[in-house]
């Protein structure tokens, strides 16, 4: 089976969030048994092309977007995946000067790339074309209007239903879409506005989200009734599939960043397992200047953004100070107000013996925290899937979550973690923290059972890939 994914980020090349990681994991698992290709734009300021001798092909092609255009497709293989990067030769201003993936002109830029990608797919042929989020939503309409050879199915995965790609009809008219297919993207209430996600929903053969609960949640999203109508119309061709994590990348067995490696098998003698985590905790506390070495350690490894529940993060700080346990927060702030608030907290708590706030992201430090911490807190307002809780469980770190989206699908309260539900109830959140910390301190048998359940949780990529293959073959 030949599968082509189209997206605007892919973790080995460039990424801004979970989409890039999820696509990489899925493509890697599929590539084990199927011809798998990922098509993304080339961002010259953000990624350097492999040397020419490492490329497997360089193709020139034409596409139509705001007139006849030309592009170059550079292809190479990475871990069995064919990666194709598009340089828009006659529209270089769209990507060549971009210093971030996302800019203020995304709809036009991503539609131009989608037009080039669709032209390439029509030329190359594929059995499955798999789109990721609204960014490449135009590809669905273009391939429905002019299918490629051997095309069996167009699949759309919604990594974040909150972003939809609102744009103008004028931009859709710049493509080769005819009036019928433009109407699939158009808002009835405002014919001059088109929504790339809306058209992709109608033009795809199957729609997936990244967790079963998130699939149910988006059917109850009434923030735009026309988008609600579109997703409701596809509900019989909608399925939630949990992302997996790459256990060869994430795991304490061989992670070179840890003070002490450890395995799930060590848990046959729990004291040896917890001794290994304690050695990682001691090493981390020395790095961060923390002193409550024998207290429970809770971590938050997250972007600090409204989606991630920053109001709960502040409550966690207060709770840790009141209850004498360690709290470590690491992540980049999004938004000036949040940055100012957390920078002030960081400064005021700089000498705290049990709280550290690090307003940056370090992959090495994140891994050390996963291994050292006893618990990881993820109080998200919404979470389509979430990989952090799965990574935490791989390291034997118990997740404390809000029961939404993929967090609800992966964490069972009192079984392999702790959860709360109300997105605005500080009392419920603090009760969850208290229960988790008290269990750690006073009920060692129950804590061992919870950690064991975390280690037994299956989050491998192959499970997710097989579920996608079922959809491809339907």
From Swiss-Prot:
Role summary: Synthesizes alpha-1,4-glucan chains using ADP-glucose.
UniProt key word Transferase: yes
Family: Belongs to the glycosyltransferase 1 family. Bacterial/plant glycogen synthase subfamily.
Keywords (A to Z) from UniProt: Glycogen biosynthesis, Glycosyltransferase, Transferase
Listed name of the protein: Glycogen synthase
PANTHER family in the cross-refs: GLYCOGEN SYNTHASE 2-RELATED (PTHR46083:SF1), PTHR46083
Biological source species: Chlamydia trachomatis serovar A (strain ATCC VR-571B / DSM 19440 / HAR-13)
Pfam families, alphabetized: Glyco_transf_5, Glycos_transf_1
Coiled-coil region list: none
GO BP annotations, alphabetical order: glycogen biosynthetic process
